[in-house]
């Protein structure tokens, strides 16, 4: 396609597209099945930036199907009383920012109308699973719950577990052990630890142990709460004889 509208006549079907065409210049015969191809981000109205597509300016232009490219996930919306618009997305996700089913849209013309069907195509799918670990007292218990949560995900897919919630500072989730135990369940496994420590300073006010003194000093420091939690977590691992995760 050039910058302006380019038309391809296939008898019953007319296809039009351009890299930056003027919507006002689009001319489509009402008696034909009209498919328009554009690349950009849809906006409702007003001014937009580069790769911006105005829905309002494409209404009532005899469009039956507006094929859009730019977003990497399938989406569809009503254009007007006659037409619909679809982002087909990408054929396969390329990372955990492109989760979910990927594929293409199959168009069929029947009785001067166009029918569209999303066809899943990717052999492997990216999944991101948030999971609240609050209340799990042991790694085996948490592992069992995670296996149940992800039981419907095929082993050929890619999975990222995002652990959330508050955990006891004495027994935080062992990310390395979970990674080792669950790695064979998927083609690729990533675990992101977004948990926070459930610390009540009153629990350590009268604790005369090295641990108590360490936690009191960290909580009294000028570090922000996130950094305090990171330091406490590393310190407690070291006190237990484990390798701190810095």
Annotate each predicted stretch with a short phrase.
Residues 1-86, 90-95, 99-101:
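His/Asp/Glu-rich metal-coordinating catalytic cores
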Residues 32, 106, 153-157:
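Short coil/turn segments at beta-strand junctions that form active-site/ligand-binding loops
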Residues 69, 75-142:
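A conserved active-site cap/scaffold subdomain adjacent to cofactor or substrate pockets
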Residues 111-246:
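Accessory, non-catalytic peripheral segments of nucleic-acid enzymes
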